[in-house]
Amino acid sequence: MRLVANTKSAKKRILIIRKRTMRNKAIRSAVKTAIKKFEMALKVKPAEEARELLRQAVRALDKAVTKGVIHKNTASRKKSRLTRKFNSVYKAS
């Protein structure tokens, strides 16, 4: 691991940033996975399973907001869109 920084504090900041970047990527990936699972469930699963996966996706989004990975308005927009998708599929039928 080669650090370009000169000062001790700058080297430490680089290490901290790398650690946080890895954590943020993991959280963001978990959010994307939860959303994809929900969207797949809309196509093939019954309403109860899709509703549970919607809850999990919303929970993942809320956790990401709590950790500071995504902005609260972004999460709110995504939750709204997922809920609208759910309602359009299951309320119409």
Curated annotation (Swiss-Prot):
GO MF terms, alphabetically ordered: small ribosomal subunit rRNA binding; structural constituent of ribosome
Which spans of this chain does the record mark as coiled coil? Answer: none
Q: Which residue ranges does the record annotate as region Disordered?
A: 72-93
Keywords noted in UniProt: Ribonucleoprotein, Ribosomal protein, RNA-binding, rRNA-binding
Please indicate if the UniProt record lists Ribosomal protein as a keyword: yes
Q: Which InterPro entries match?
A: Ribosomal_bS20, Ribosomal_bS20_sf
GO biological process annotation, one example:
translation
Gene3D superfamilies assigned: Ribosomal protein S20
Know the name of this protein?
A: Small ribosomal subunit protein bS20
- The gene it comes from is rpsT
